[in-house]
Amino acid sequence: MVFLKIPGVNNGHPITVKEIIRIQAISNYSRIYFTNGKVIVVAKVLHWFEDSLPETMFARVHRSHLVNKSFVEKIKGTRSKSLVLYNGDSIAISRRRRVLIG
């Protein structure tokens, strides 16, 4: 099991990475969406998460989104593609990142 320790979050206890659905950038903060429906905002940039999380589990699909690959249900669209996650969230895939996703 893979864990991530985020300073100031969860009383300093590590978070189980497989419980993170996606992370959204909000300026110098990031919004983390969890499988239990919980959403938290942390004072870390998305790049920090990209460097801290395993590449095999997470993909940067847009300038403002990092998604857990295991929660991707499908890719939709022909010209402008987007990911549909298991919880129904739809996230645009940037043109630059489409090649990496498929």
PLM features: residue spans?
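Basic, polyanion-interacting recognition surfaces, primarily
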Residues: 1-102
